[in-house]
Amino acid sequence: MSVMEEAEQFAVPGVPDAGAEVVESAPQRVLLVWDAPNLDMGLGSILGGRPTAAHRPRFDALGRWLLSRTAGLAAGRPDIAVEPEATVFTNIAPGSADVVRPWVEALRNVGFAVFAKPKVDDTSDVDSDMLAHIALRRDEGLAAVLVASADGQAFRAPLEDIARSGVPAYVLGFREHASWALASDTLEFVDLEDIPGVFREPLPRIGLDSLPEQGAWLQPFRPLSSLLTSRV
């Protein structure tokens, strides 16, 4: 019996040979996509104007929450590498670069990648860029996707398709503007104000304990049509 034959005889099943090439699988991403133009508009409508420092989202707190969520997903998949990816997509209006630069640099300083696109007309929004990036990461391997946006027209169908494939899909935003996500049977909704530390002070959202003298409408959490679905 040759030395090679003897080695094969005593090989342990399931244990790779010392000389064999070990191929590591690519890490799966927990992808966060922040739709800055959309959320800026939504926050402005809640505040009735531009946010002060107390009401601007804290991306360091959001990043810590994403890391915690990633760790939870990784704990259930010990055989797969899971990595977080935090991204912000924004438009840069002509002449606003100097104003926006400190914000962009602050985002990059806490680990967020920023996709910035010139805003030259109504067709130069970043919706298609966000969807393309989600599709790219899905092809490479997604552990979960989290989209911070109220734009159901752009995101509902692709996110529900991802969720149906078995990948958790979350929508982050303000419940006043996210009835489409709340009504979905496949998407999970997280209100940004429920994430610890994202806002330094409570947002002035209208509730029963904060009604104006003239009264106010309290919008439904989900559309009436959701009564026709299984999720009531």
List the model feature ranges, each with a label.
Residues 2-124:
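Domain-level signal for Mg2+-assisted phosphodiester chemistry and nucleotide/NA-binding surfaces
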Residues 1-26, 208-232:
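Actinobacteria-biased recognition of intrinsically disordered, low-complexity terminal regions
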Residues 95-231:
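Nuclease catalytic cores that cleave nucleic-acid phosphodiester bonds
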